[in-house]
């Protein structure tokens, strides 16, 4: 199963990272992450990109 993971806020990356791990344990493939708002100063995107380099991340608004 392929999954588009959508979250309201990308800050530190903790919630999205946990969701990706859960999807992997359930046998799903996360094909993209979409955040409605990204808080750039907290470096969540950098953390997620380093840990999951094959999963693209998009944000509608970056603050």
Q: Residue ranges of each PLM-predicted region?
A:
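Conserved G/P- and acidic residue-centered "switch" motifs that form tight phosphate/ATP-binding loops
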Residues: 8, 13
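PRPP-dependent phosphoribosyltransferase catalytic core
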Residues: 17-63
């Amino acid at each position: 199963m392929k999954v588009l993971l959508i979250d309201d806020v990308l800050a530190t990356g903790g919630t999205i990272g946990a969701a990706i791990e859960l999807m992997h344990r359930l046998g799903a493939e996360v094909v993209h992450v979409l955040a409605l708002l990204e808080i750039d100063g907290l470096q969540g995107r950098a953390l997620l990109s380093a840990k999951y380099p094959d999963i693209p991340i998009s944000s509608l608004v970056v603050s």
